[in-house]
Regions:
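Conserved alpha-helix/loop element of class I SAM-dependent methyltransferases that forms part
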Residues: 57-77
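Conserved class I S-adenosyl-L-methionine
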Residues: 76-87
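Phosphate/oxyanion-binding active-site loops and adjacent basic polyanion-contact surfaces
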Residues: 53-60, 87-91, 113-117
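Phosphate-coordination loops involved in phosphoryl transfer and adenosine-cofactor binding
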Residues: 78, 105, 153
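Conserved SAM-binding loop of SAM-dependent methyltransferases across substrates and taxa
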Residues: 88-103
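Class I S-adenosyl-L-methionine
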Residues: 1-36, 44, 51, 63, ...
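Conserved SAM-binding motif I beta-strand of class I
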Residues: 107-112
């Protein structure tokens, strides 16, 4: 018996709506593969509420950073960016994907003290072919003097820099003569709550 199956079932309204919402959220040119690797998108290419919040936050920061990069000589074609306290490197990967990937030059450095996160990020960059990304297992003091980093860094970022990490990122930026620093301390919500109580 010869039975033919339809190659694709028609999209349900729910799936079509989810696809439309995803298209609204994602930036043009954003790699779905990267977002799946970062677990921002599910294997099926869907976005859950927690991931939506994280992505919105990173995209918001990217808008500021992209503008700063474009103001550099040659619109940031050879820019260097160091992401301090990179963690899982969401910010660094998304900046690379949306800004650096299409350019011939420039480099993103992820600086992190947790070795397992550095190794994971290195492996992901290699899998994705992001050849101008480096991940360094260094402290702030070490990174300011490290030979793996250029003498001058154009942009320093630190997203959710805990405890003294914001101060450390500022010290690094000053040591590396950074043109710009984009820093987001993690405790701002705690401080705001304390201020409301007083």
């Amino acid at each position: 018996m010869n039975t033919k199956f339809a190659s694709k079932a028609p999209k349900t309204n729910k799936v079509a709506k989810a696809d439309a919402e995803l298209a609204e959220v994602l930036k043009p040119g954003q790699s779905d593969e990267l977002l799946k690797e970062l677990h921002i998108l599910t294997r099926e290419g869907r976005l859950n509420q927690d991931s939506r919040r994280k992505l919105k936050q990173v995209y918001h920061l990217f808008q500021f950073i992209e503008q700063l990069l474009r103001e550099l000589p040659e619109e940031g074609a050879g820019a260097t960016l160091a992401d301090h306290g990179a963690g899982k490197s969401y910010l660094g990967f998304i900046i690379y994907d949306l800004f650096f990937r299409a350019r011939q030059g420039g480099h993103v450095y992820g600086i992190e003290t947790r070795g397992e996160l550095v190794e994971r990020s290195r492996a992901l960059a290699q899998r994705l072919g992001f050849g101008r990304m480096s991940f360094l297992n260094l402290t702030v003091a070490e990174s300011a003097k490290a030979s793996e980093l250029p003498a001058q860094i154009d942009v320093v970022t630190a997203l959710h820099a805990c405890d003294t990490a914001t101060d450390d990122a500022i010290a690094f930026g000053l040591a590396k003569k950074a043109r710009c620093m984009v820093l987001v301390p993690c405790c701002q919500a705690e401080v705001a709550a304390c201020l409301r109580e007083t």
